[in-house]
Amino acid sequence: MTEPIRLLIAASGTGGHLFPALALAQQLPDYEIIWLGVPDRLETTLVPRQYPLQTIPVEGFQGRPSLKTIKIGWNLLRSVFTVRKLIKSKKINAVATTGGYIAAPAIVAAKLCNIPVIFHESNFIPGKVTTWLGRWCDTVAIGFRGTAKYLPNCATVWISTPVREQFRQPQSLDLPIPPNRSLIVVAGGSQGAVTVNQQVRSCVPAWVNAGAFIVHLTGKNDPEAATFSHDHYLSLEFFDNMAALLQKADLAISRAGAGTLTELAVTQTPSILIPYPFAAENHQMYNAQVFVDAGAALMFAQKSLTAEQLEQAGLDLLQSPENLATMAKAAGTLADLDSAEQLAAIVRASVEKSR
């Protein structure tokens, strides 16, 4: 009996790391997938219903060196040998990762075991792990065309960023949205956006008067979300069919995580982007700039954005269907619908080459 091909997927933390990895896994139904994550992160909720999950206690280095830095470094070193043992015991054939600090022990352990590593970097400016360890990977697939120049010593290939299958098929939206109103979708990403939420609520009356219906995904950490109500305004902590929402939306107001931007591109949704100001190396700002340069989005820095500016930007776009149509078309040029298949093909080719 032929042994199944076993792939270790190292992806942890936010939806931006997890959803592209899940999209890859969906394209490898004949592979045995084992997931590597971190305790108490989003993957402990999303992954176990589909794939066996192994966890290691790693975290990224933050701030100035301290006693905690030593502990983090020790845990990373221990994790390398934990993952190496996992690779050997499970007879893993290859490792795929979407970056973040969990990628480091996975890449090093794979090199120690002499098995291929496939890395997907979704941000325009590569993260530290990509920059440091990308040269150890067989392929570094990138989400933005311009990223290759930051990785001169890596075997890069542009494939866009994989999205979940539902984003590639028409979805029905089970929400009470009047057919004669423009739809604005506001989403703060998996980490929420309380400051932006407050500004959006002050804009709602003007946008509704201009003919809009607003679906506002507030996240779970917004204390004012339960106290605000308005006609043609729906507030939800979370909605599990973002594909349907964005396919229906005339305009999105969003953070600028790479995964979110790819979903906006695939659904051809014009956007107002407010990059998360505390993202590592300000990567969301650089991601958003690509969409601005392409004519697919407007961008505002959170620290200088006022509610009045946001309100006017929304009104200007609502009152210009031609501009929205141009932005939608531009967004569609920034992603590839077949990204997940391309990444799966890279994995398959790497495994075949190594056997």
From Swiss-Prot:
GO molecular function: glycosyltransferase activity; UDP-N-acetyl-D-glucosamine:N-acetylmuramoyl-L-alanyl-D-glutamyl-meso-2,6-diaminopimelyl-D-alanyl-D-alanine-diphosphoundecaprenol 4-beta-N-acetylglucosaminlytransferase activity; undecaprenyldiphospho-muramoylpentapeptide beta-N-acetylglucosaminyltransferase activity
Key word Cell membrane present: yes
EC number(s) recorded for this UniProt protein: 2.4.1.227
Location of the protein in the cell: Cell inner membrane
Major localization class: membrane
UniProt entry keywords in alphabetical sequence: Cell cycle, Cell division, Cell inner membrane, Cell membrane, Cell shape, Cell wall biogenesis/degradation, Glycosyltransferase, Membrane, Peptidoglycan synthesis, Transferase
Name of the protein: UDP-N-acetylglucosamine--N-acetylmuramyl-(pentapeptide) pyrophosphoryl-undecaprenol N-acetylglucosamine transferase
Organism annotation: Synechocystis sp. (strain ATCC 27184 / PCC 6803 / Kazusa)
Lineage: Bacteria, Bacillati, Cyanobacteriota, Cyanophyceae, Synechococcales
